[in-house]
Amino acid sequence: QTYKSYNTTLGLRGDINDDWSYDIYYQNSDVNYANEYRNDLSVIAINRAVNVVNVAGVPTCVAKLQGIDANCVPYNLFQGGLPGDAGIQGVIDGGQTAQDYLAKSTFINGDGKQKILSGYVAGDTGFTIPGAPSSVSLVIGFETKEFAADFRPDTATKMGDRSGSGGATLPIGGMYDVDEFFMEVGIPVTNDLSVDAGFRSAEYSTGSETDSTKIGAYWTVNDNVSLR
């Protein structure tokens, strides 16, 4: 197995004026993987290799005589080995030519991707509740995310030709994205009490939407006790 991971992150932040600032970033992540499966016997090759006839005293594959597979090598399932070895020793005893024909390397590759673009502006609204020590603060932002994954087995794996794989493994892939908007507000009430609230809305490319809200308060009872 081989995994390669790539990640790029770019960001920019600064002040718009004395009261407002901004922060924006972009992230691109990509994970590639390659899996190699060695020495699984080919189901197709086995079926052809055991279908043998005698041609002038020489065991010959029917597939070779019919022009289906010129590389077919006869395989004696009962040659060598011990009971219960599933004929593997027969492949080994058959020599390198039989091993190369019957035992295959197969591959499954794939990747996962993620892209995120996010940003917000934050600042002082200049609006103050009567009696409050400072003005109301506000954060407004957005986030857009894209996710994708791809699973790519080779032809032999898709056909179920790997005798040790338990059957065919089909390719699959997909992606979705989500666009989000959020807002948070901080409201000083007194020197000891402040209230905060937030809202976030998300829209998914799969057709669903979600909204969430929060509200909270922070109260400083004394120098040693605070409640939130």
Task: Show where each model-derived region lies.
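Surface-exposed, low-complexity loop segments enriched in small/polar and acidic residues
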Residues: 1-178
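Residue-level signature of outer-membrane beta-barrel architecture
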Residues: 10, 14-16, 123-127, 183, ...
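Repeated loop/turn-to-beta-strand initiation elements of outer-membrane beta-barrel proteins
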Residues: 19-22, 149, 192-195, 224-227
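Sequence/structural signature of outer-membrane beta-barrel proteins
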Residues: 31-33, 147-149, 192, 200-206
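Feature captures outer-membrane beta-barrel proteins of Gram-negative bacteria and organelles
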Residues: 46, 181-187, 211-222, 227
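Short glycine/proline-enriched turns and hinge-like loops at secondary-structure junctions
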Residues: 132-134, 207-210
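Alpha-helix capping and helix-loop boundary segments enriched in small/acidic/polar residues
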Residues: 166-176, 184, 202-207, 216
